[in-house]
Amino acid sequence: TEQNIGGAGGFSLGVKTSVLGGGDYTWMMDDDTIPSPKALEALMQTATQSNDIGFVCSKVLWTDNTLHPRNIPGGLKKDTIENNGITACRCEVCTFVSVLVSSRAVYKVGLPIKEFFIWFDDIEYTLRITKAGFKNYYTEQSIVVHKTPDVYDPNIEQAPVNMAKRFYYQTRNTCYFKHREQPNKLLFRLSIWNKLRILKRRINRRKDGHKQEFLDAVKKGCHDGLTFYPKIEYLPL
């Protein structure tokens, strides 16, 4: 698009275009993901076993061929399935670095939240699919390489100043998630206050002269997160 809609907006638009175009599945990847030749085949072998499967994600390596710590699925279980030599185990949440999502799941739970702009859209979306009752899987036989500059996420104590804005989105988006999962308004506000307190403490450990930029970002993120409640877009059946 001509407008910068962020990673979240791009994923949301991509899924929408794929599903409305008649696709049964959408393979979501970061722009720095390099799939192995049989990565998609392993995903499809798993995803097509049942209509109850919402998504299947890949094993993600870093450029040195070690497991990428940012992209290990959450909620892994010993419950496994097998098809044509491809084995997969249950999981609950994953990143968008390489995940195959069924259109059935998209029609039921809606699109990824484009208003997130960046960060946490993948965790929110895959957990939404899991909570809708779909069975989701991780297969180590679908392998991709995630060519990030560093193997770990930049933390707020050391991140360069040009990333301060990203921590605004991270803070605001996680506040939204807490709001959705915690219906008690008092407990929700207490959790946001505690989050801000922890972030301030971490920012104060910075060794450079850019503490204020990060403090401003997370304060605004917590403030906006109190009222940030975007509507989920559903596709017409």
Summary of predicted features, one role per range:
Residues 1-21:
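Glycine-rich, basic loop-to-helix element that forms the pyrophosphate-binding segment
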Residues 11, 38-42, 121:
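Acidic donor-diphosphate engagement hotspot in glycosyltransferases and nucleotidyltransferases
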Residues 23-32:
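Short beta-strand-to-loop acidic/aromatic patch adjacent to the donor-nucleotide binding site
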Residues 36-70:
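Conserved donor NDP-sugar-binding/catalytic core segment of glycosyltransferases
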Residues 82-101:
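A recurrent flexible, glycine/aromatic-enriched loop bordering the glycosyltransferase active site
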Residues 99, 105-110, 115-142:
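A short, conserved alpha-helix in the catalytic core of glycosyltransferases
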Residues 139-159:
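Active-site donor/metal-binding and catalytic loop motifs
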Residues 183-237:
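Non-catalytic, C-terminal membrane-associated alpha-helical segments of glycosyltransferases
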